[in-house]
A protein has these predicted regions:
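Extracellular glycoside hydrolase catalytic/binding regions
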Residues: 1-96, 100, 109-143
Length: 144
């Protein structure tokens, strides 16, 4: 805090950053703290969404520092319907989020296909199913 008093500090929460209720019960005494939440749309559904909404409505500063469109293993089928519900909720409360994972590992959570070896100038063919979906999501979103 001495060097950067206005810097935001992201604080993880228990159980893979899903228990934001623990942060709400005993928040840190600092003006620039946000509590992290992780979700995987194929696994985490209404229960975690409802918990997030409850604490967001009460002003808990939340940042989704990891989310995937598949199940919590990082692999398995993508659930784009659940992903859409999640992102709609995050946008409703202006909660920032980061997609997992920017990799070419042969898993459904990877944004790139396993055979993509580029480090820039990616094409649609370099993107996995998840990568194509998230690209289309941001491309088609209206920004205010």
């Amino acid at each position: 805090r001495e060097k950067r008093p206005d810097a935001v500090i992201l604080v993880g929460t228990p159980t893979w950053s899903q228990e934001i209720d623990k942060a709400a019960e005993s928040p840190l005494e600092d003006k620039n703290v946000m509590y992290t939440l992780h979700f995987y749309a194929g696994t985490h559904k209404d229960d975690l969404r409802n918990r997030l909404e409850s604490y967001a409505q009460n002003g808990l500063p939340i940042f989704v520092s990891e989310f995937g469109m598949c199940d919590a293993s990082g692999n398995g089928a993508n659930d784009f319907e659940s992903t859409t519900k999640w992102l709609d909720l995050l946008n409703k409360y202006q909660i920032s989020f980061m997609c997992w994972n920017l990799a070419n590992k042969d898993e459904s959570s990877s944004v790139f296909r396993a055979n993509s070896t580029k480090i820039s100038d990616w094409t649609e063919e370099d993107l996995s199913e998840a990568g194509q979906w998230i690209k289309a999501y941001f491309k088609n979103r209206s920004y205010q």
